[in-house]
């Protein structure tokens, strides 16, 4: 992938949607919930504070993160689906 996010934006590879329920029933594509977690693949340089200082990003490539259901913009690059979102759309880093 040759994408580099700008400023405080983050590129996330969403986790795949569940294919079947815990009981073993297969879920059709129309019934699948969008996952609200994924892996960070790239981060921007950060954002500028009011004083003009560059604030470092709290996430880094490889982090597993939780984000809002409607966060980010969906993009497809080289057949792969990604989300581009602001750092503030990320709720937590999974440890």
Swiss-Prot record:
It is found in: Cytoplasm. Its main location: cytoplasm. One of its GO terms (cellular component) is cytoplasm. Disulfide bonds: none annotated. The keyword Chaperone applies. SUPFAM superfamilies: GroES-like. The keyword Cytoplasm applies. InterPro entries: Chaperonin_GroES, Chaperonin_GroES_sf, Chaprnonin_Cpn10_CS, GroES-like_sf. Keywords: Chaperone, Cytoplasm. GO terms for biological process: chaperone cofactor-dependent protein refolding. GO terms for molecular function: ATP binding; metal ion binding; protein folding chaperone; protein-folding chaperone binding; unfolded protein binding. Belongs to the GroES chaperonin family. Heptamer of 7 subunits arranged in a ring. Interacts with the chaperonin GroEL. Together with the chaperonin GroEL, plays an essential role in assisting protein folding. The GroEL-GroES system forms a nano-cage that allows encapsulation of the non-native substrate proteins and provides a physical environment optimized to promote and accelerate protein folding. GroES binds to the apical surface of the GroEL ring, thereby capping the opening of the GroEL channel. This is Co-chaperonin GroES.
